[in-house]
Amino acid sequence: REDFQSWFTAEGIRPVKFTRNTNEGRYTATNTYHYMWNAAEPYIAADVYSSSSGQRNVNMPLNACPYDLPALFFLARNMDFDSVVPGKRYPMTFAIDDDIYNVYFILHGRETRKIKGLGTVRTIKFAAKLLAGEVFTGEEDMMIWVTDDDNRIPVWFEAPIMVGTASGRLAEYSGLKYPFSSLTNK
């Protein structure tokens, strides 16, 4: 079970605070980040714990703008995909645990996809680089499909794991800001 929470500015999606609570069987982890933008040398003050590494407090530099995972997904959902070149790698930086990673996403284009429980949906498909670790091999990208409308709701994902593939779908939705216009039929 994973719980990620992110606080960031509306303008520019600049991270302010991030918390992570992970409980996956015998593995547990917590992260609490405070982004210290006003310091002479900006940094992330990170309080990090994992059952495999213990407790530690670290300061990570804010040389670029390392996003946390929820802010990174929010940023990706709000991009102007009409100005993104399909097949081109777009770099992104994010922080997790006590490290900063350089990753990328690649737009694959638009496609219509049947989603169990929803119906047929017009989507935007893109890939995100995965990091090697306890679950992912890091050799393949996670594929993500978001609605091709103003909501940009993630409706499906597939991610290769050590043994097999993890996948997930949107099961239900409510309170959308915009009409679900990419849903072509139920």
Where are these regions (language model features)?
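Acidic, serine/threonine-rich low-complexity disordered tracts
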Residues: 1-39, 80-186
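Active-site/ligand-binding surface loops and adjacent short beta/alpha elements
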Residues: 37-96
